Amino acid sequence: MKLVKGQEVKDFLQSEVVGRSILELAGEDQNYFVALVDGIPKDLTYRLTGNEKEVVLLDFNSEIGRETYWHTTSHIMAQAVKELFPQFKVTIGPAIENGFYYDFDTNGYNFTEEDLRNIEDKMREIIKRSLPIERIELPKGEAIEYFKKIGENYKIEILNEIPDEIVSIYKQGDFADLCRGPHLPNTSYVKAIKLLSSSGSYWRGDENNARLQRIYGISFPTEEQLQEYLNKLEEAKKRDHRVLGKELDLFSVHEEIGPGLILWHPKGAAIRRVIEEFWIKEHLKRDYQLVYTPHVGRSKLWEISGHLNYYKENMYPQMELDNQQYYIKPMNCPFHIMIYKTKVRSYRDLPIRYCELGTVYRYERSGVLHGLLRVRGFTQDDAHIFARPDQILDEIKEVVKFAYYILNRFGFKEYEVFVSTRPKDSVGSPEMWEEATKALMNALNELNIPYKIDEGAGAFYGPKIDITIKDALGRSWQCTTIQFDFNLPERFDVTYRDKDGIDKRPYLIHRALLGSFERFFATLIEYYGGNFPLWLAPIQVAVLPISEENVEYADKIYKALKDNEIRVTINRSDEKLNAKIRDAEIEKIPYMVIVGKKEREQNLVSVRKHSVGDLGKMTLEQFLNLIKEEIKGGYTH
């Protein structure tokens, strides 16, 4: 058996490993948290049978290592809460992308800042106790009896839904939790912790269920790593799109209208319009055909598409009109297919590329709604490509290149790409899956784009490529999806007439480059911290007359900029110049044009750049050339 520990590889005979734990073989090294035993995550306390071929130790740099570290910390937090508040009930506490959370039934009590400090102190105490963490496997019935005895009803509910007869709990000191694991060997492995916040949640995310209290936290192997993370978090708070959206007057959400339904204010709408015009122009350049489709469709359409059978819980309730049932659309695809089907298509017509900025509505539980990132009404930059088998490789390559072009234009430079393959339950022949998956991989290989395989994570109707972008703080944001669909062409009987005169099924490729406008806008706000590049800025220039006697000249400058299609505002108030400059800086307007007596007499303007300062005097023509060049340069700012 091979034991891989970083760069070090050791070989063991079968007789040397039987009955021994991984920890015994690896040595007491608190830099490693979990092991992959022949590819399966296991506790370091796992006892080997002698049949294993390879054991790989994982540290905090691995995803599984981090998950294990954070999941154990969530158990430590739950233990701390139970020791301080024994009357509260535990529910679930997973590791998440950045840290962990645990939900507690507090019977209506809301955790305070002081509570979080006390829980944190108690966690440090539990860590110092160096409690061994033990995995116990037992019959489900015994586990139910155990949790009944200690009054943890949520655990019983979970157990009743587990089909397995043998389940596992993890025990540290007097605290035990139902869990699949894996976990750290000992509480002392956790070194640096911070509880970040508490908020309300609902059992299973359903507002009809019990209201819970959720505590979020983070932990690291060193204090330095924790401090670095907290610094990033502080910066992220300053960039929070919900805060900046309000400060910069970009969008709002109103209880009277409904959660997850966005109002785009004039400044937000100005940015959206720029993105829309750019998006349409670039699509028309690449032979996409722009379409528009209605917001509602008859129930018959959604029956054919399968949405009523498989997606109804995510749809808004039906409406009835003239004895017909209608639904607000959750997706644009069926409409694009109906456009395709309005005439017989020849093999010569393909590929056909329809694109639309289509607004869709999906029911998301209120507990998961989050600013612009998770909403109920949103606009997708949708396109559907109908192609012959011999065209799919080139089509995928062109879509990937197009995605990179678009995202680069907005200033993004770091990407991660994933190919999701066939899940257990799927539609479409194995041959179609193989051909489509191969086309996705070959396209990326030919473009020299590195990617990771997300095994079995494709949708049931086809494999896909996902492109995520990284922002200045290293956070990942989901953007582009390129998705094959073997389901809808069958359901709608989509065909083209091939050169042999036989009707054949085209490949259907769904793709969205930005994802949704709302989510992409949130990403842009946080990426730039509200300091949008000039071409995107809702107001590009603020004209600031120093006094009332300069307003007439300032108006001429304002009109000239307007005539040159510059998004401009003018501050005619009687405030002092410094106050006007401060206001423009707060609004993050890229350029300020200051006009006073000297500028008026010399027919010049004084130019100031946001966060940079004074650029000196120049003619209006020189200033226009300056900003037009910058706008042409796109994301440079």
Where are the regions that the model predicts?
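NTP/phosphate- and nucleic-acid-binding module
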Residues: M1-T91, I96-H637
